[in-house]
């Protein structure tokens, strides 16, 4: 996904992990990605920029359509992050400047490492199920890896573990000794939880991580409180398990990680450390520098960068 605000501010993001278990609700805001494709942006927002290394979370759908392609995000650049694409329903087609063209379906993972620079697009493919529902998330890369060579990996199957009435698919990182095959560069976790039947579930957690959950489908209760759609629930640190009551068919996303120990600066689709790095990346994109390459398989124009005013970064 892309941040299409006409004049985005640079956001300064630092770890701000609660020192104990907590429950704080953050309502996602609407963001229009063009062509009427509206997402709910749960990260970053006022009061909560990071959950571990997770710095961005867009939730789109569920929607049904009869013609056309509701998702058509033209080529745009990234630096300093990994993108995680996860679908609940439907299909999406990834194309990038490394030459990859990859269809993704529910239960599969697209993981793109931007490193020093990459460009990609995301579209509804011509042959599709006329439905779309999913997430795109970003992981901030730590300083030692943020300027590495870009790469893309598709994982067609992922490991699963069962807790009570709930199936947990390990998308990113490790849960209860079960590890995703996806390569990441920080201590982190991303898991989709799905209930086969009504009941209570206790999911083991790493107490040193901070965590958050987002309802995707159905009815889920945390501490006898029903989770609201379109709301990110931040859970703090120090939890050894997550106790939930779910109705059959419910699904939610759990994300977390060690509090990210580096200050980052986010602007448009870039995760950097200084305003000068952002200005250089923007200039390279606008001048068609080989740093980002071309998404040759995409038919249409790429996204222009918004204007950049190097105001002092807006703290969290």
Regions inferred by a protein language model and the residue ranges of each:
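Jelly-roll (double-stranded beta-helix
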Residues: 1-316
């Amino acid at each position: 996904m892309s941040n299409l605000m006409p004049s985005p501010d640079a956001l300064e993001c630092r770890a701000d992990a609660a020192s104990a278990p907590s429950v704080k609700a953050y309502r996602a805001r609407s963001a229009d990605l063009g062509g009427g494709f509206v997402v709910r942006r749960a990260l970053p927002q006022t009061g909560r920029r990071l959950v571990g290394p997770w710095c961005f979370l867009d939730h789109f759908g569920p929607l049904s359509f009869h013609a056309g392609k509701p998702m058509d995000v033209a080529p745009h650049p990234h630096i300093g992050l990994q993108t995680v694409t996860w679908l609940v329903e439907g299909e999406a087609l990834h194309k990038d400047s490394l030459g990859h063209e990859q269809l993704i379906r529910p239960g599969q993972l697209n993981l793109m490492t931007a490193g020093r620079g990459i460009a990609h697009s995301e579209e509804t493919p011509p042959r599709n199920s006329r439905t779309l529902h999913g997430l795109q998330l970003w992981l901030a890369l730590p300083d030692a890896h943020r300027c590495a060579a870009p790469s893309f990996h598709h994982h067609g199957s992922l490991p699963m573990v069962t807790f009570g009435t709930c199936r947990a698919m390990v998308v990113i990182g490790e849960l209860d000794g079960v590890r995703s095959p996806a390569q990441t560069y920080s201590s982190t976790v991303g898991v989709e939880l799905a209930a086969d039947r009504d009941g209570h579930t206790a999911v083991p957690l790493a107490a040193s991580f901070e965590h958050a959950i987002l309802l995707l489908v159905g009815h889920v209760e945390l501490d006898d409180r029903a989770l609201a759609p379109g709301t990110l629930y931040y859970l703090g640190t120090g939890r050894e398990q997550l106790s939930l009551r779910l109705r059959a068919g419910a699904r939610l996303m759990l994300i977390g990680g060690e509090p990210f120990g580096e200050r980052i600066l986010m602007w448009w689709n870039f995760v950097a450390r200084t305003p000068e790095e952002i200005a250089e990346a923007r200039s390279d994109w606008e001048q068609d520098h080989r740093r980002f390459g071309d998404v040759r398989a995409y038919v249409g124009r790429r996204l222009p960068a918004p204007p950049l005013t190097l105001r002092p970064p807006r703290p969290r």
